[in-house]
């Protein structure tokens, strides 16, 4: 006999645990299944058989990562799939009997929550370009973090060896200074080589302003004649770090090129780029965070809630109208919206006017930028809904 069933999946990397319940919360299936296509297809078939023609609702606590294969198979099979964040499962577990925590219990809680709740977000087939952008932007973030970790230790040993050279160059921005460190790290080495040889070394490696950089380096070297303890070992470390940073710069550039190529192929690229403050990277991060499909967000308010730009009430008793920042939101989406708003203040007069107005109202800088980001998100959502590019507001002077 046909019956509706709910299948809760506690997802993992190597395997998943599935619990299937009926309308009375009776357990029909409890099974651990390997994260393998054949095993997952068998599980889907088994759950479908249990329903015997009734509606099957799947719920899972991951929307990417180890659950990607199962999600793809369920969507391809036309199954209804809901997403329950792990934080929600954790808090819901407190309302169930017992303090124990097992994969089976988590899967049962996920299935039961899917059975009772009607506000869970369905998972849809991802936009291929948005999925690729999510991978690339995540990789870019890792590379930038690696570069930051490398450049900071690079500065500290260099400061101990040649503090004057450290003050003369910004290694975070000057590629020529990094090239210099791959060949010369100590005052003695710079003085022995001389300005002409150092400049030739830089020109051979296509450094910009080679003569100026060489002259600055020699001036710094002539200002320090003392030998610092551990100087030779520190010089070796500095040279390796400089090469590492340069290699990371190359990889970041290659990643940026791949991001731009894919982003410009997306149907929303032209619309997003027309919005002041959005460039290729921030636009790609926006698409990666939203999935590239505004149909998933019924309104601009819903999108703002996901981005963490919609304040939530914290009322209790006689206290009302107490609005706070939400705790659960997409950090990547908020970052893209916040940074684009920050850029638009410098490039767009209307954004600057709105920001200044919020500042005169007593808002702090961060609060004013967040308010601007919320306003811009409303506009961007409407633009994507109507497939219209941004047109600055124009005013007509009175005659």
Swiss-Prot record:
Residues of the signal peptide: none
Q: Which PANTHER family match?
A: PUTATIVE TRANSPOSASE FOR IS117-RELATED, TRANSPOSASE FOR INSERTION SEQUENCE ELEMENT IS1111A
- What GO terms in the biological process aspect are recorded for it? DNA transposition
Native species: Mycobacterium paratuberculosis
Give the matching NCBIfam families: transpos_IS110
Entries under InterPro entries matching the protein: Transp_IS110-like_N, Transpos_IS110, Transposase_20
Keyword presence, Lyase: no
One of the record's GO molecular function terms: DNA binding
Q: Does the record carry Transferase as a key word?
A: no
* Name of this chain's protein: Insertion element IS900 uncharacterized 42 kDa protein
Which domain of life does this protein belong to? Bacteria
Family statement: Belongs to the transposase IS1111A/IS1328/IS1533 family.
Key words of the record: Transposable element
